[in-house]
Every structure is written in C-alpha cells, then in structure tokens.
UniProtKB/Swiss-Prot annotation:
Residues 1-71 are cytoplasmic. It comes from Bos taurus. One of its GO terms (biological process) is clathrin coat assembly. GO terms for molecular function: clathrin light chain binding. Residues 1-21 are annotated as: Disordered. Keywords: Cell projection, Cytoplasmic vesicle, Endosome, Golgi apparatus, Lysosome, Membrane, Signal-anchor, Transmembrane, Transmembrane helix. This is Neuronal vesicle trafficking-associated protein 2. The chain crosses the membrane at residues 72-92. Belongs to the NSG family. It is found in: Membrane; Golgi apparatus, trans-Golgi network membrane; Cell projection, Dendrite; Endosome membrane. InterPro entries: NSG. GO terms for cellular component: cytoplasmic vesicle membrane; dendrite; early endosome; early endosome membrane; endosome; Golgi cis cisterna membrane; late endosome; lysosomal lumen.
Length: 171
C-alpha cells in the first residue's frame, strides 16, 4: 500500500516506517514542461485547397462528367421507371379486378348479366352476340329510366297507370 500525503522528492530522506505498514512509493513522477511540448517551428506552411487541384487548361469548355456518374444516373432512373410500372400495374389490376355478382348473375364484359340471358344467347349462333349486347344495353337503360321515373313518395302503380299527354307534331 502507499502512504498518503507523502512527498516524492523526499524519497530517500526517510526510511520506510515499519510500524505504519505503508510504503512510501511515489505514484507519479514530476513532469517537466520541456518534455511535454515540442518547440514551436519558426515557419508554418499552410496548405490550401488550390495547391491540390490540378491546373485547369479548359476553363471555358464544358467538362464532361465521368462515365460512373452516368451509370448511376441511368440505374436510378431505370429503378424509378420500374417502380412506376409496378404501381400502374397494381392500380390497373385493382380497377379491373373480377367483381362478384349477386346470385343468378354472371360477370361478363365488365357487367353483371342475368344467367338466363347468358345461357339463352350463348346457346344460339355467333351472330346473336350483337343482339345480346343490344338486349343488355336496353336492360340497363330501362333499369335507369325506371329508377328515375318513380319517386319514393309515389306508388309504382300510380306512375304506370297515369295517362300521358298526346304528343303534337311540329314546334
């Protein structure tokens, strides 16, 4: 153990006392200022940034970027184009997803069609396809006009049995 409050310069002056049980060993040797710091130089050279740049012979001409910069730019633009295509594909599939139709209807040509109409026109000849689409368009027009003609405050029978005024030809 080391005895506290002992002076390291008096190391050899006193013999270690046996009765204390401590040894007087200096923990830190004294430091001299001359050893801590190198002498300051008389001339200091400060290197600036312009010393490291090569002389530019073509100051007025356009400097062509490196090929590596073009490669990175092309890769980034291709990645963005790919991601844009993926987003458009997902949005397209979301809008054209096969919708479910009520019971008794079949989904054809982006519409829910009654299964009986589909079975009737699919069993006929191929030229009946045009008639099939005509029936479907009339069906949807009739459905729209019926929904507009009948208000919630009128009964359906009153609207159907009302006499219509005769149409006059002319202006």
């Amino acid at each position: 153990m080391v005895k506290l409050n002992s002076n390291p310069s008096e190391k050899g002056a006193k013999p270690p006392s046996v009765e204390d049980g401590f040894q007087t060993v200096p923990l830190i040797t004294p430091l001299e200022v001359n050893h801590l710091q190198l002498p300051a130089p008389e001339k200091v050279i400060v290197k600036t940034r312009t010393e490291y740049q090569p002389e530019q012979k073509n100051k007025g001409k356009f400097r062509v970027p490196k090929i590596a910069e073009f490669t990175v730019t092309i890769l980034v633009s291709l990645a963005l184009a790919f991601l844009a295509c993926i987003v458009f594909l997902v949005v397209y599939k979301a809008f054209t997803y096969d919708h479910s139709c009520p019971e008794g209807f079949v989904y054809k040509h982006k519409r829910c069609i009654p299964a009986s109409l589909d079975a009737y026109y699919s069993s006929q000849d191929p030229s009946s396809r045009s008639r099939f689409y005509t029936v479907i368009s009339h069906y949807s027009v009739a459905k729209q006009s019926t929904a507009r003609a009948i208000g919630p405050w009128l009964s359906a029978a009153a609207v159907i049995h009302e006499p219509k005024p005769p149409k006059t030809q002319g202006h």
